[in-house]
């Protein structure tokens, strides 16, 4: 069996380099969801319907809640109301086979059933109440310390106390 693709985020916190997060994508169970995320890491699909590049580079983690998760992926508006998939509109929930079992789980943020775009979150704890509602499509394999550093500047409202930016991102060739 082919190995899962790996992608990376080079993160900054408050403008300072914070390290690299490497994520493995579950292309076996969630191929459509994983491919969307992979392509948004590389930027290879060009410009989307919004007129913005279909690329996470330069976008922020706009919602960070300690003891819950770090959310990003809104590269069109930057505030949690935007984002766009490589498929154009929103796309369906592929399946809920994988669960929110603990820190480092990578899952799709949504606004209800079948509303996946580009927003995602990385769990910092087990979030089993999200099972069956959000599609788990990967996990952090390196840089959980960076995720924890991001979590530390979160707040109960979700607004980070410093800007958290994906300075660079892409796919790691195996």
From Swiss-Prot:
One of its GO terms (molecular function) is peptidyl-prolyl cis-trans isomerase activity. Gene3D superfamilies: Cyclophilin-like. The keyword Ubl conjugation does not apply. Binds cyclosporin A (CsA). CsA mediates some of its effects via an inhibitory action on PPIase. GO terms for cellular component: cytosol; mitochondrion; plasma membrane. It comes from the Eukaryota. One of its GO terms (biological process) is protein folding. Belongs to the cyclophilin-type PPIase family. This is Peptidyl-prolyl cis-trans isomerase CYP19-2. It comes from Arabidopsis thaliana. The gene is CYP19-2.
